[in-house]
Amino acid sequence: MSSSGAKDKPELQFPFLQDEETVATLQECKTLFILRGLPGSGKSTLARFIVDKYRDGTKMVSADSYKITPGARGSFSEEYKQLDEDLAACCRRDFRVLVLDDTNHERERLEQLFELADQYQYQVVLVEPKTAWRLDCAQLKEKNQWQLSADDLKKLKPGLEKDFLPLYFGWFLTKKSSAALWKTGQTFLEELGNHKAFKKELRHFVSGDEPREKIELVTYFGKRPPGVLHCTTKFCDYGKAAGAEEYAQQDVVKKSYCKAFTLTISALFVTPKTTGARVELSEQQLALWPNDVDKLSPSDNLPRGSRAHITLGCAGDVEAVQTGIDLLEIVRQEKGGSRGEEVGELSRGKLYSLGSGRWMLSLAKKMEVRAIFTGYYGKGKAVPIRSGRKGGSFQSCTII
């Protein structure tokens, strides 16, 4: 099937099919495309276009191949067990693009798939056909291969009428960009830990009855994000968070879903609680940035995008949400006229002491990282991270 024919079809207008930068960027990621939709709505056609576009390193797993009739999963427990085993085997083989073709109309089923994606460090993209008849049961009755009646189709419809919202939306870095930023962050921690100005301020990082001459910051920030790094835009809590539905329904969010972006990193920072990278958002990226997240208090009037960051690590008992709060406190201080004291030069730029155990490395040359805008749909809890390589299994990590 030629993907050139996709350009003229409105139902195939997705960035991952039409935007060449996105196609190239997805080649550097591990992505699980989960198709959702009623039988006859065009899922299988869409799945074939995705496979055709990405070719090598791509695998499709289709419920049709297991003779699963769309509907309640209970009647096909053995078939689904086999499908899931085959899907996990594909994950272990590190296919860059996996396509799962099924109705996926039940939340419980989706949650199983999200957990699998977490275990093998795949980013998830939910895809629904854009065909005009996708929710028209009268038309679907004629189009579906299973000869399901309109009443059968109506029973499946409620789970597909509303968008499934993630825990949060954000830009997820490619494996290559993630590794490069991670390495830069680790070097910063090592250099900062050895710097004489930092050693004078150790009291912010150790308790008073613990005399120390040095601290290993790489170990101190031991709570690390597994897999690829990300920059959160909107925390949705699966639709329960304030403003989540409104954010997800914005045209710019829908059009940008699974689209490639290049993010600019201007600085790295350390506080007694977190370490992260400061992200400078372009005008195009600010269009995806919520209006209400750049405040610590209602009276704050900080520049839009002030909170944009990538968490690189947290101290033991600290949650990842703290990284953005720490950055906002730094920006608030800057807005008040204090950029801190320049205390030296590290390999990547100038080092500033901001007081209270806070440090900023202003990068002499800003870093550019490639990322995909999508959602994180997992539980955000510790999961056993599995490697695609034989015998490779990592310890449980917390998604942050």
Swiss-Prot record:
Bilayer topology annotation: Lipid-anchor
Glycosyltransferase as UniProt keyword: no
Protein's name according to its UniProt entry: 2',3'-cyclic-nucleotide 3'-phosphodiesterase
UniProt GO molecular function: 2',3'-cyclic-nucleotide 3'-phosphodiesterase activity; RNA binding
Gene3D superfamilies: 2',3'-cyclic nucleotide 3'-phosphodiesterase superfamily, P-loop containing nucleotide triphosphate hydrolases
Entry similarity comment: Belongs to the 2H phosphoesterase superfamily. CNPase family.
Pfam families referenced in this protein's UniProt entry, alphabetically: AAA_33, CNPase
Domain of life: Eukaryota
Positions with a binding annotation for substrate: T232, T311
Residue positions assigned to the propeptide: 398-400
Catalytic activity, reaction form: a nucleoside 2',3'-cyclic phosphate + H2O = a nucleoside 2'-phosphate + H(+)
Enzyme class: hydrolase
Localization in the cell: Membrane; Melanosome
Organism expressing this protein natively: Bos taurus (Bovine)
Biological process annotations from GO: adult locomotory behavior; axonogenesis; cyclic nucleotide catabolic process; oligodendrocyte differentiation; response to toxic substance
Sites bearing Cysteine methyl ester, chain numbering: C397
Lipid positions (S-farnesyl cysteine): C397
